[in-house]
Amino acid sequence: MLALLWFAVPNASQARETLTWLLRDLPPSTLFAGTMQGQGAIDQLMPILTARMPEYDHVLMHVNRARAMQMLNDGAALSCDPTMLWTQERARTIIYSIPIFVLFSSGLIVRKEHLGRFEPFISQGQINLQALMASETVKLGVVAERSYGGLIDKTLDESDEQTLSLHYGSDAVGSLLQMARAGRLDGLLGFWFEVRYQALQQGIDPQELVFLPIADNPLYQLAYIGCSDTPEGKHAMQLINREMRTLRESALMGFYARWLDPEQQQSYLSDVKVIFDKQ
């Protein structure tokens, strides 16, 4: 089901083009329901960004990843997604913004009681995902059509499909965590801040889970806004880049930091400032 929300801009001229923002249910980046609805990092960014782009009528559409990719790729209407990782394949049909937000890289999340089955593949606190998947000894949950970064994506593409459980629906991360808790999965790939949030919502102590960084993966990943690669999309991206050069530091990185473990927040904010100064 698609949910539509319109953002009106006062005193703007008529006959403006509609810009549709494609939002997925990815707590705590976006929070579509519950007591903290609308308080996700991207939720808080959207009204600020859209208010600074009065050239458009802005529509927020709730979709899953598969539908978002379909709309971006076909380019029939001007659409943008504010929660994208860059991949070479996507860049053929999608235009990307400047980096808008820095994420701690995704990794493997397992229950602490099951850590032993992964130990042969762990060295210096990091897991060799390629060797793990080649062993065909575990079944991991992933969100269908989601990018986890180049190294992980390549490994998944080369893995036997029987070792993966792909989730296509809404609340994918929460559902995969439930499956792991029930013993139907050995673990799931994901971003720790998302899984930590879902664990708290499900009454799971995050201390019962272990986040394993992927060997040879960078500490951080860059996230972007992606728009349809059309003349209209290119024009919208010029305006998005203009605004996000300011908003990524003045607003968004703080919105994200509040969802991190408290001991990570200060180092994250310092690191992100250095990263953005180079971009």
Residue ranges and their predicted role:
Residues N73, P82-T93, D153, D186-E208, ...:
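A ligand-binding cleft/hinge motif common to bilobed small-molecule-binding domains
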Residues M46-P54, M133-S170, A199-D205:
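Ligand-binding cleft/hinge of the Venus flytrap
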Residues L60-A134, P213-D216:
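Acidic, polar ligand-binding/catalytic clefts
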Residues E17-F32, Q39, S123-G150:
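Short loop->beta-strand "edge-of-pocket" segments that line small-molecule binding or catalytic clefts
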Residues D43-M53, V110-Q126, A134-S135, K139, ...:
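Extended ligand-binding regions for polar small-molecule ligands
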Residues R52, M61, A66-S79, M133, ...:
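Short helices/loops that flank or line small-molecule/ion binding pockets
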Residues R24-P27, V102-G107, G203-N241, Q266-L269:
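Periplasmic-binding protein-like
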Residues A15-T93:
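Extracytoplasmic small-molecule ligand-binding "clamshell" domains
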